[in-house]
Amino acid sequence: MRNDYLNLYYNCDSIAKIEYKKRDEKIDCEIDKYYLDGNHYNSKDKEKRYKIEQKEICKQFEVIKKHSNNKATPEKKAQSKLVLLNNENEDSNWFCIDVEYVKSFNNRVEKKEADFNGRFDIIALSKMKPHKVALIELKYGSGAIGGTSGICKHIEDFSKFCEKGYFEGQLKQEIIE
């Protein structure tokens, strides 16, 4: 949960945004239409997101699951399996608390000025005190090492994340809250 909403994930893919509207005393759900109809939409297309009743998400679960499975890459499937198996393992020293973490900004101007667009595959917290935080990037196959989301890019992102104080200033606080 972050910024008064939570993301519903399947295959480490954000399926829906779920938000409690205190003023209206109701839950709003918004889903990427791909998971309902299997059609890909332009990211700027206003038709891409769809308001949906929470009961409808449950009714459509098999359809959503099917489309997510079609979209999931081997890396995403491995990431999802790693998180699930780790968190089910009582003997693990770590507990995965978040997937696909993106630093939030107050607005687009702040985001542009920050010049930071990094994303971490998994955030894990050690079970033993003193607690430690692990920012995990998973790569699947040699083809995932180079390119725009390769190892070098993630090292740069991690360095920027630490240099700009995002770990101490925001992530730590989000974990505590």
For each of these PLM feature ranges, what is it?
Residues 1-177:
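Charged, terminal alpha-helix-loop-beta segments
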